UniProtKB/Swiss-Prot annotation:
Origin organism lineage: Bacteria, Pseudomonadati, Pseudomonadota, Gammaproteobacteria, Pseudomonadales
Catalytic activity: 2 a quinone + NADH + H(+) = 2 a 1,4-benzosemiquinone + NAD(+); N,N-dimethyl-1,4-phenylenediamine + anthranilate + 2 NAD(+) = 2-(4-dimethylaminophenyl)diazenylbenzoate + 2 NADH + 2 H(+)
Coiled coil (UniProt feature): none
Alphabetized InterPro entries for the sequence: Flavodoxin_fold, Flavoprotein-like_sf, FMN-dep_NADH:Q_OxRdtase_AzoR1, NADH:quinone_OxRdtase_FMN_depd
Protein name: FMN-dependent NADH:quinone oxidoreductase 4
Gene name of the encoded protein: azoR4
Organism: Pseudomonas fluorescens (strain ATCC BAA-477 / NRRL B-23932 / Pf-5)
Length: 206
């Protein structure tokens, strides 16, 4: 049975345009895959505990699983490992990731657990699976109207590659601060693009 992990990184939670589009996509996927199971992690509604000295110290000890925060890390990694596909809905904050998504990354990107490191660099330990990222922004950072840099896309791509995830797609919702008409236009454009290339085509029903 197919398993989809949805990460909502917006502090606006269910009210974010990215998350609303993500839930539309989930509904569409369920029509194609009736047995699809959804695991939704809302990082805004249910924030993760901050990392501190105890966690940093545990990373360097021979028995790291004694640290309570490692239970959080293992739980998040387990959600990722059990998923057949990953859908991330995230805003762009100050040219890059929101703090909530960065914290999720810090929990799941763990040496000797989700990646190894050797003379040739870091190697992901997770099995590859399709990943789709919905990026929402008030301004424009892609295309002819771009007026700001995008550090989110290359950084998140590198993080996912380090985990072992290479089947990546990004969809951008831009110009969301320019009123209701602009919001409708960017959502319609995204829906149109996604209709031409259905999400997670490689998934098969169990």
């Amino acid at each position: 049975m197919n398993n989809l992990l949805l990460i909502n990184a917006s502090p606006r939670g269910q009210g974010s345009h990215g998350n609303q589009l993500a839930l539309e996509l989930v509904s569409s996927l369920r029509q194609r895959y009736p047995h699809l199971e959804l695991v939704e992690r809302d990082l805004g509604a249910n924030p993760l505990p901050p990392l501190g000295m105890d966690y940093a110290h545990a990373l360097t000890t021979p028995t790291p699983f004694d640290a309570p925060l490692f239970e959080v890390s293992e739980g998040l990694i387990g959600e990722l490992e059990r998923s057949d596909a990953l859908l991330i809905a995230t805003p762009m904050h100050n040219f890059t990731l929101p703090a909530a998504l960065k914290l999720w990354i810090d929990y799941v990107l763990r040496i000797h657990r989700t990646f190894s490191s050797g003379p040739e660099g870091k190697v992901g330990l997770l099995k590859d699976r399709p990943v789709h990222v919905l990026v929402s922004s008030g301004g424009f950072h892609q295309g002819e109207r771009a007026r700001q840099p995008d550090f989110l896309t290359p950084y998140l791509r590198q993080v996912l590659n380090t985990l072992g995830l290479f089947d990546l797609q990004f969809t951008y919702l831009q110009g969301l601060v320019f009123g209701d008409e602009a919001v409708r236009a960017t959502l319609d454009e995204a829906r149109s693009a996604l209709s031409l290339q259905p999400l997670f085509n490689p998934l098969v029903c169990a």
